[in-house]
Amino acid sequence: MTEITGPNRPQPKPVSLDPAKTAVVVLDLNARCHDPEEVCSQLMEPLGGFLERVREASVPVVFTISLQFKGTPLGDAAVPLKRRDTEPVLYPDAFDKFAGGELQAILSGAGTENLIVVGSLTNVAVLYTSTAAARVHRYNVIIPLDGVNAKSTYEHEYAIHQLGILPAGAGDLMRFTKLDMIEFNL
C-alpha cells in the first residue's frame, strides 16, 4: 500500500494567454461577499484588481450566482468586482455552472479555448465547474490559487488535488497559477 502524505500542492506557474481565446468565469461572488464573515469576502480586493486587468485586455467575463439568490438583494454580483452591464450574470441551479447550457453557449460563441476560473468555494462550484470545463468541454482551465477559496484549508487543498488528478486527460488541462502570474499576449 502506498503511504499518503496529503494532497498534491501544485506550484503556481506563469501563464501567458491569447485574450481572443480566453474568458473568465466568476463563480458565486454575489452580494453576500460584502459580509466580512463570509469566506468569499477575502477574494474581493485581489479579484477586483485582476478583473480590471482582464477587462483592459478585452477578455470576456461571465458571472454566475446560485439560483437561490435570483431576484433577491443577494442576487447581484459583489460591488467590489465592478461588474459591467455587458458582462452576463447566469443563475444556474447546480454546483456545475455549465448545467442548463447557458455558460457553454456564451463561451463557445466567444471562441473560448482557455477558461480562467475564479470564485468560491473551491470544493463546490470551482471543483464541479472546472471538472466539467476540462472533462466535458475540453477547455484549458486556468485556476489562480489566490483567486479561489474555501471555508477551510483542507477543503481548498483537497479540491485542488482532485482537479490535478482528473482522469481521461482532464487533469492535464488544468493549469495552476496566481493572479499576478497571468499575462495576456496583446
PLM region spans:
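Active-site-adjacent betaalpha module
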Residues: T2-A23, G71-L186
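Acidic-leg catalytic submotif of subtilisin-like serine proteases
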Residues: A23-L29
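A cross-domain feature marking catalytic cores of carbohydrate-active enzymes
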Residues: L29, F63-S66, L145
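…and closely analogous acidic/polar surface helices at protein-protein or active-site interfaces
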Residues: E37-V54
